[in-house]
Amino acid sequence: MEKLLERVNHILEALPYITKYSGKTVVIKYGGAAMAKADLKESFAKDIVLLKYVGIHPVIVHGGGPEINRLLDSLKIPTEFIHGHRVTDTQTMEVVEMVLTGKVNKQIVSMINSQGGKAVGISGKDGNLAKAVKAPIEIELEGKEKQLFDVGLVGRIESINPEILHNLQKEGFIPVISPVAESVEGDSLNINADTFAGEIAGALEAEKLILLTDTEGILIDGKLATGLSRGKMKEYIRKGEISGGMIPKVECCLAAIDQGVNRTHIIDGRVSHSILIEIFTNQGIGSLIES
């Protein structure tokens, strides 16, 4: 009986959050270990379906780097790197789009639908969802100032037209978006999935943006930091306390906040049901950044 009461208490703990977020949009960037391990994939799909059943509108933007690497290797397509960043030429971009939109996207859709959801897979090209421009990347070389490097068909979002997402949500569907967009010249461009998720969240005026990562969250002096303001994050970056791959994730969160997203979260996707823990428990998980 005690165990049953404990389960009931867990459900009751979620009630105020269900009330608060019902009818709201939550954008989730799906990537890392959560996409690789079978048990985590299943828990992710169940989390998404449960969100929909309690009236929350999840929108998913996904990555897929490891799958791209595997197919490029199997096809023996040579890859050029500039300071660790892949150069995406036309042949590589064909593989990127095929893997992200044709394979990974449909696997996620199938996974969610198998748990009782109604997911629909699209890319940034569908319904003119996203327009992008080819953009160089900024790299800070040791002992030198930041420099710009051309890495091929890699883009930056110029505009989002969320009409297709609104229509899908209105009909009860869960949008699953691959991070490929089209330039005004008609070229397919690979977009950073974190950045794309942030832009989608801003355009939808989402209540939350959640980034699933392979870390606990933002670590400052080895300790998990949360309840962080925009100003504090800028200070941490300036002082070098946030560095490497975490910087673009934080900048993505800050950009989303600037566009009106209320709360952004960087959470540990290696933890089963981390999305539900974040949204429906008092303690939450990972790092919260808010305006």
Curated annotation (Swiss-Prot):
Gene Ontology terms describing biological process: arginine biosynthetic process via ornithine; L-arginine biosynthetic process
Source organism, top-level taxon: Bacteria
Enzyme class per UniProt: transferase
Positions bound to substrate: 64-65, 86, 190
Residue numbers marked as site, Transition state stabilizer: 29, 249
Entry EC number(s): 2.7.2.8
Pathway: Amino-acid biosynthesis; L-arginine biosynthesis; N(2)-acetyl-L-ornithine from L-glutamate: step 2/4
GO molecular function (one): acetylglutamate kinase activity
Cellular component terms (Gene Ontology): cytoplasm
Subcellular location: Cytoplasm
Principal place of residence: cytoplasm
Listed InterPro entries: AceGlu_kinase-like_sf, AcgluKinase_fam, ArgB, Asp/Glu/Uridylate_kinase, NAGK-C
Summary of the function given for this chain in its UniProt record: Catalyzes the ATP-dependent phosphorylation of N-acetyl-L-glutamate.
Stated name of the protein: Acetylglutamate kinase
Species, as recorded: Leptospira borgpetersenii serovar Hardjo-bovis (strain L550)
Gene: argB
